[in-house]
Regions:
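Active-site histidine-acidic residue metal-binding/catalytic motifs
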Residues: 73-187, 213-216
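Helix-enriched interaction subdomains in cytosolic or periplasmic regions
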Residues: 31-36, 41-78
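Soluble non-cytosolic domains of exported or imported proteins
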Residues: 2-7, 116, 120-128, 177-184, ...
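Solvent-exposed loop/turn segments at secondary-structure junctions
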Residues: 19, 42-43, 104-107, 144, ...
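Active-site-adjacent mobile loop/cap segments within catalytic or ligand-binding domains
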Residues: 214, 225-228, 251-314
Length: 314
C-alpha cells in the first residue's frame, strides 16, 4: 500500500481488529495477510465528520485516527455488558503496545484452591485482573491485545468466579490440550503481532503475563515478578512494578511488602520477542489471607490499577 504514515497504518490495523472483535470478519489479518482498507483512510486527504440523521446523534469520526478524549463512544463487548462502554480518557499511552496474557485457560484451569466450600481456579482470577488492566490501558490510548479471551465472562465483581473452559486465544483459536502447544500458540501470536508493529515503527512493546501461584496453605506470599533473562528493559520494568507495589502496600495496607523480582526459565519469557516481558504472580491461591487479594473485587481492581499506574508513570 506504500503507507509510511504511522497513524494511518495504525488506524487501518485498528479498523481491522475492530471488525474482528465485532464478528464482522472471521479471520485475523495478521494471519491471513488480508487487510480490509477503509476508502476514506487512503483517499480522503482531510478528516471527515458525518452526523447521523437521527435526532441527538453524535458526530462519528471517519478518520479512525487517535480520538480526542471523550470524543466518541467506544464499545468492547469483552468487558461485559456493564463495562463494555470504555471511554477514551487520555492519549497518554498512545503509540505503546501491550500484549496481556492471563495464565492457563481452556482445558487448563491452572492452580486450584478452595474457600468456604467454593473451588478457586487460577485461570479465572488471573483473567479478571488481566481484563481490568486491559480496560485501563485502552482508556488511556494504548493498543492492547488480550491474548487469552473468554467470550462471555466479562469483568466480574462476585467473589467466586465460576469455572468454565470456553476460553480461546486471539484470532478465536481453540486452546490445545498439550501444554507445550498451548504455550507455543501464545508465543506465536505475540511474535507475529510484535513483528507487524515493529514494521510500523513501534518501539514500545510490552508483554505482561499474570498468574496465581500455589504453595502450602500456610505460606503467605506477596505479589512477585519474573523478568526475561539478559533483558535490561524487562528487569527495569519489573523493578518499577516492585517499587510501585511496595509503595502501595506500605501506604495503603500499612505493612511491609516482601515481593521479589528474579529471572526464571519460563517458556513465555524465553520464546517471545517483545522488547520487554514480565511475568507476575499475584499470590498463593491456597493461603486464606492471600485469597482475599483475589476474592474481593476491589482488591482485584487495585492489582490492575497498580500495574497500570506503573506504565502511566514511565
Amino acid at each position: 500500500l506504500k503507507i509510511d504514515d504511522w497513524k494511518k497504518a495504525k488506524a487501518i490495523a485498528d479498523y481491522n481488529h475492530a471488525l474482528r472483535e465485532q464478528g464482522i470478519r472471521d479471520d485475523n489479518f495478521i494471519h491471513s495477510r488480508r487487510l480490509w482498507i477503509p476508502w476514506h483512510l487512503v483517499h480522503c486527504t482531510e478528516e471527515e465528520v458525518v452526523v447521523d440523521k437521527k435526532p441527538g446523534a453524535r458526530p462519528v469520526n471517519l478518520g479512525g485516527l487517535p480520538a480526542e478524549p471523550g470524543s466518541a463512544e467506544r464499545r468492547y463487548p469483552i468487558f461485559g455488558k456493564t463495562l463494555e462502554k470504555t471511554p477514551l480518557l487520555s492519549n497518554r499511552l498512545n503509540g505503546r503496545v501491550f500484549y496481556l496474557v492471563s495464565g492457563h485457560g481452556g482445558p487448563d484451569t491452572g492452580a486450584q484452591g478452595s474457600h468456604d466450600g467454593h473451588d478457586l481456579c487460577e485461570d479465572e482470577y488471573a483473567y479478571d485482573v488481566t481484563l481490568r488492566l486491559m480496560r485501563l490501558l485502552l482508556q488511556h490510548g494504548a493498543t492492547a491485545y488480550m491474548i487469552v479471551r473468554d467470550p462471555n465472562d466479562g469483568i466480574r465483581d462476585n467473589p467466586y468466579l465460576k469455572l468454565d473452559k470456553d476460553e480461546v486465544v486471539w484470532g478465536n483459536k481453540k486452546i490445545p490440550f498439550d501444554q507445550k502447544e498451548r504455550l507455543q500458540q501464545r508465543c506465536d501470536i505475540i511474535n507475529q503481532l510484535t513483528a507487524e508493529h515493529k514494521k510500523w515503527g513501534v518501539k514500545q512493546q510490552t508483554m505482561i503475563e499474570i498468574h496465581v501461584d500455589s504453595r502450602h496453605q500456610d505460606k503467605r506470599i506477596d505479589v512477585f515478578f519474573y523478568h526475561r533473562k539478559s533483558s535490561g528493559a524487562s528487569k527495569t520494568l519489573a523493578t518499577k512494578l516492585l517499587t510501585k507495589f511496595k509503595q502501595e502496600y506500605e501506604s495503603q495496607l500499612d505493612r511491609t511488602y516482601h515481593g521479589t523480582i528474579s529471572t526464571r526459565n519460563l517458556y513465555s519469557l524465553d520464546n517471545t520477542q517483545t522488547p520487554r516481558a514480565v511475568y507476575i504472580e499475584l499470590g498463593n491461591i491456597q493461603n486464606e489471607l492471600d485469597q482475599q487479594r483475589l476474592l474481593i473485587r476491589t482488591n482485584r481492581q487495585a492489582l490492575a490499577n497498580w500495574i497500570f499506574q506503573t506504565f502511566m508513570s514511565e
